Amino acid sequence: MILWRISAYADLSGTGGLRVSGRWHQAGRPVVYAATSPPGAMLEVLVHLEIDPEDFPTTMRLLRIELPDTVSQAQLPALQPGWSAQPELTRTLGNRFLDDCSALLLPVPSAIMPSTTNYLFNPRHPQAQSAKIQVEDFTPDSRLF
């Protein structure tokens, strides 16, 4: 299984999740958000930025995360329409997954493109050690901004 992430840090420690809440977790829990493709990873970054192309951080890298196909995945309960406008709901579900620590990954829908799957990666799960990271430099196309 291959997942993708855009980050300035080539690690999967999830320390960002300790400092800042996300759609699927509250601050104080280590977590890594990843996408199933490089464009999906880019979309998830772009939605949070309001910058010109020349201001895109030069420290950002594309991380290719390779995992065995056999890693454990939790199952998200069925979501009702309007779920993306309910941060308390999504954070509660993500927090449960992270706190339970019974699986490495939780597939979640993208709020930007709900037919697209993203993943929460639990760095506290024992299988987290099986992840291999390759780092790629990249410069986003200026037409994206």
Curated annotation (Swiss-Prot):
SMART domains: RES. It holds the Pfam family RES. Its EC number is 2.4.2.-. It comes from the Bacteria. One of its GO terms (molecular function) is nucleotidyltransferase activity. Transmembrane segments: none annotated. It is an enzyme of class 2 (transferase). Coiled coil: none annotated. Keywords: NAD, Nucleotidyltransferase, Toxin-antitoxin system, Transferase. Toxic component of a type II toxin-antitoxin (TA) system. Expression in E.coli inhibits cell growth. In vivo it is probably neutralized by cognate antitoxin Xre; this has not been shown upon expression in E.coli. Probably depletes intracellular NAD(+). Belongs to the MbcT/ParT/Res family. Homodimer. Forms a complex with cognate antitoxin Xre; the 2 toxin molecules dimerize and each contacts an Xre homodimer. Most Res-Xre contacts are between the antitoxin molecule closest to the toxin. This is Toxin Res. It comes from Pseudomonas putida (strain ATCC 47054 / DSM 6125 / CFBP 8728 / NCIMB 11950 / KT2440). The gene is res.
